[in-house]
């Protein structure tokens, strides 16, 4: 059962995330359809009318969400940390940009110069908030909310990792394996023969025959006769067949266990949707809290690991492991084709993400990344 502080923390985080997503949606619409300028509903776009109607409907919905979020978060602004305050500033920018137009008189009055600079007024307001008798309680409440957010995030991370893992292992050991072993003799498709298992069995049988002859030569005994050798090979062949039949069911067991783990993961996500929103805000704060050099280092590490010049060996090991896990033959042609195409597609998507998103959110990180890569 959640405490009052945790529930309040979840509410604030949920409101902030909804407003932030709405503000990002408006920014995306501005960039894609209005040339990175404010959206003008009366402007006719060079798109079908149905698409423009959908764009305007999304825009009005997102603006309303931003306004509601702004009004809900504004009284608790002192409880926000630096990352959350950055999100709130984006929401405030959107709200001010699309505020309802006032009359000409009020507009002329609003354009009148302020008697004092806004920076000085902001400093006075900051000092006033610090001298406010309730400022200490507000700071403590903000600290508690961030602490609750961290605890909730760590809890949901552990649940997302441990629950599927435990369900997979326990279902495979206590439910799936006994059921498959019991049904396999009567259902041949559960233990269908696999070419790679047959090849391994033939190779083991050949090695077994060579070992018998080698042991006889080492001990100085006579080489077993053809009949004795035939009997030993028949016994060994039956053992290898039983082992191959058991191994052939491993793929079915792995698939069923993975499905059970996937269902458990989806169940955890469904019943903890509010906690997942808190986790998203926590991860955003952790990522955006990194310095530009740390962000660039993480990006270079990720790209070199998955799309770098030395990544084919890692992809080959990964694909072979996946094929063995699901009982598929590790086809060399498919692996080479995958390595030749997928990292290129991944690198293209990553460069597009840098161009479209990271260049707007953190241009200094992009500049640092280019400097660390040695590009001009």
UniProtKB/Swiss-Prot annotation:
The keyword rRNA-binding does not apply. Keywords: Cell inner membrane, Cell membrane, Hydrogen ion transport, Ion transport, Membrane, Transmembrane, Transmembrane helix, Transport. Coiled coil: none annotated. It is found in: Cell inner membrane. It comes from Prochlorococcus marinus (strain MIT 9303). One of its GO terms (molecular function) is proton transmembrane transporter activity. InterPro entries: CemA. Required for H(+) efflux immediately after light irradiation to form a rapid H(+) concentration gradient across the thylakoid membranes. Together with PxcL, contributes to transient H(+) uptake following dark to light transition. It comes from the Bacteria. This is Proton extrusion protein PxcA. One of its GO terms (cellular component) is plasma membrane. The keyword Ion transport applies. Belongs to the CemA family. NCBIfam families: PRK02507.1-4. The chain crosses the membrane at residues 150-170, 251-271, 299-319, 334-354. It holds the Pfam family CemA. Its main location: membrane. It is a multi-pass membrane protein.
